[in-house]
Swiss-Prot record:
It comes from the Eukaryota. It comes from Schizosaccharomyces pombe (strain 972 / ATCC 24843) (Fission yeast). This is Mitochondrial zinc maintenance protein 1, mitochondrial. PANTHER family: COMPLEX III ASSEMBLY FACTOR LYRM7 (PTHR46749:SF1). Belongs to the complex I LYR family. MZM1 subfamily.
Amino acid sequence: MSAAKQCFRNLWRASNSVFEGDPMILAAARDKIRTGFHNHRCCSPEEAKKEIQNGNAVAEILRRNVVQAEKQSNDTYSLKIRKTTEINTNRQFTEKKFPR
């Protein structure tokens, strides 16, 4: 299978997983994937390789860093965290740093 087709499938599967249950966003993501591949159909091999790397990186970012949130009745949100979701402590953003 060609690298471009593998990248397309990788992005398609990532968007299906991440945007499951949200048909409007899933349709927009699919449209963006199709448009991106259509616009880069006739590019040089070097540019194609770069775009394939970018596409695979986007799929990985979607899987690891995008979560869906659903508003609950008590002004809180329920997050849909998947097995692939990256969970960090964000210590670098929560520690207060004061100049001396």
